[in-house]
Amino acid sequence: MFRTISRKNMSQKLSFLLLVFGLIWGLMLLHYTLQQPRRQSSVKLREQILDLSKRYVKALAEESRSTADVDSGASMAGYADLKRTIAVLLDDILQRLVKLESKVDYIVVNGSATNTTNGTNGNLVPVTTNKRTSVSGSVR
């Protein structure tokens, strides 16, 4: 008899502990979700990347103009190499952003498909298609 009472008591303690843990976890998740700064859309991020790269290239051009008296041939070759390197890096960043976007869209679509409450599963279409344009051609 004592064992059945202690089992119920342990079960209640464990249930209470799990309930408190779940409540704390839920509150922390809610707090984290509300306190996170809003994410910028990928289009804005792409525009910022391109704008910053243009400014950087302009700054390098001005710097190369100021040092053109010293060694114009080598600095211009270095400038062209640097410009190509930046273009390749920016293209790689944009490709990674597109891949990340497609993964997030896939997760969003599949996550919403598993959480249907009415039991009807319609045809699911990805949220976005591959909207990437060739930006690297305009940068190089």
Swiss-Prot record:
UniProt keyword annotation of Signal present: yes
Localisation: Secreted
Comp. bias intervals (Polar residues): 131-140
Span of the signal peptide: 1-35
Keywords: Glycoprotein, Secreted, Signal
InterPro entries to which the protein is assigned, alphabetical: CCDC126, MGT5A-like_N
Residue positions with a glycan: N110
Region described as Disordered: spans on this chain: 118-140
Compositionally biased residues, Low complexity: 118-130
A single cellular component GO annotation: extracellular region
Protein name as it appears in the record: Coiled-coil domain-containing protein 126
